């Protein structure tokens, strides 16, 4: 790039009636000191990617040290961060998931044995509200890596495909995604024969999938999803062509990097000759722990017999042993169609499902598949507990939150316990996406939902086990799911025979089959359609036809799992007595202020008096939640009295609460927002006719008193008189639940009885004009 020439290339994506999208690549203008830098544009979305390699290799590493970081800058969306310091902090969940989207196709594209650190930093500079940046970032990262002169088998093209009105649309806009039944990100590379090999897939149905299906849209079945993989291939080819064009003009020459083999041939040959039969016998043991113990003994045997011969090369001996183990596992599957634990290619491990195993929580379930064990726990709460998102995305809140935990003991190991790692965040997001399409709407079920998946035992596909456990737990919590969802992990073993590559697909893979296989293909769905899908591969691409063939095999397994789950629970259970009961009412928008009151005085008073939690939406929808139905009903009555008031009339009696004391009398709350004055002259009657110097000698804030409306003036001000003067003042714990019109028992102030215990040190009075018990403020008369 002499003289800092700026080079560009464009990929034009033609969606027919859905319009044209143009992805533009540019290099030479920004980040010129990076090993390779590129800017990718889609509409006004602008993403900068810089790829740099370290000068010296990390010889002590036995893996490729690739790091991908995505930096979301909130200025990209014209916003200032909401944190205390008003700057970006730790990456958002969306940024972490985008890191994984980039890493998964990039990592297998580097030459094997590379030990130099490679860092890809993607910075989101501008976000078009209509275009998602994650797929743009995949292409930008591929472009910058291609320009950096690294041993990289790119380019890699990434495209988002949405199934809208029966058509697959590339790079859909946000508004178009609202009409999509399926959303899929596909990354791949072009093979020498011109075909496209799929390297990564991340896909899910949408919140609107089931409503759209009911309106006549085609469901995202296995056949439809397979069609989407094929539809993505020409767009990937176009993106790769644009990157290759730019690289031909601006890429650095490929640098020769030192490559480090895990072992030399002489070590492998010696290991194979020494312990091959021992490894083969160990691999016939079905139990994971017993098999691993046997393999550990084989490793000790190999080190004991070969350690002196290959002194100082112990790491090579162990690496060669792993390679031998991998080879034997794959050979047995390819030739004998028998797996490590003795299963056939499509067999599923034993399944068990239970619900309601944890006391007091709102919902719980235990799902087991072989040695994989997932505990699911559901918590319900008010919508105010939705997660608030501070990202560049237009989404600002999330009602359903799925958190996945993977403690080290789940694999019988010791390790760090703390904040979630990228893998845990990714697994939780996958399970979340699998369940979102079947969740009830906010209107049908006005709750914030937190689902936690505890992977307490792991031997393959804890993420898909989390989907199953979560379905069971949600039903146990009483969540009316539109359909149950189950998931299964598929594997792939490939081998070359007579120059032709053969593929064998495995159902329900073990952890070892994941480690020694070529693919981890996770599929979740209902009985009728796919809700989520994820593909990771160690190869530099898999034919789309192989993936399409794996989908029906996954469906058969999914149906089997759903049958087992249905025996545990098939319908939503009654809600836990410890879960909040939420009722919904609608009030006129112009009454929202009256319900809230000055500085929240009225709504806080209602919440204090009833014990209910209240959330008010901008459209006048009010959600009232309480663990007891009576508290929620009391709050609803109080709100209705304000929003749809029945004006007090002369002669009506109320059981009121003293809310303010003044030199000329006390103000008594009859209804929320409706107070009346009990004049000091009336207090004299309660004091036996003697002069009252201090009104609080007779009544204090918080006291309850039976009063009658004597007069209502032209301004609506109420004058009160005490009823049955000798017993007018009630103790704090007097019954206050009854109400009636004049001539019967008195109405209560707002209907509900206040809670007796409000927490230590908390004043019973609340609001801007009155404080705690015994506190007096004077009010100047005008």
UniProtKB/Swiss-Prot annotation:
One of the record's GO cellular component terms: cytosol
Biased composition (Low complexity): 734-753
Record's compositionally biased regions (Basic and acidic residues): 766-776
Cofactor(s) listed: Mg(2+)
GO-annotated biological processes: mRNA catabolic process; RNA processing
KH domain: residues covered: 580-639
Region of interest (Disordered), ranges: 734-782
Catalysis: reaction(s): RNA(n+1) + phosphate = RNA(n) + a ribonucleoside 5'-diphosphate
Keywords: Cytoplasm, Magnesium, Metal-binding, Nucleotidyltransferase, RNA-binding, Transferase
EC number: 2.7.7.8
Superkingdom, taxonomy of origin: Bacteria
Cystine connections: none
InterPro entries, A to Z: ExoRNase_PH_dom1, ExoRNase_PH_dom2, ExoRNase_PH_dom2_sf, GPSI/PNP, KH_dom, KH_dom_type_1, KH_dom_type_1_sf, NA-bd_OB-fold
An MF annotation (GO) of this entry: RNA binding
Location in the cell: Cytoplasm
Binding site for Mg(2+): 514, 520
Main location: cytoplasm
Domain S1 motif as annotated: residue spans: 651-723
Family: Belongs to the polyribonucleotide nucleotidyltransferase family.
Function noted in UniProt: Involved in mRNA degradation. Catalyzes the phosphorolysis of single-stranded polyribonucleotides processively in the 3'- to 5'-direction.
Record NCBIfam families: polynuc_phos, pppGpp_PNP, PRK11824.1
Protein name: Polyribonucleotide nucleotidyltransferase
Species this chain originates from: Acidothermus cellulolyticus (strain ATCC 43068 / DSM 8971 / 11B)
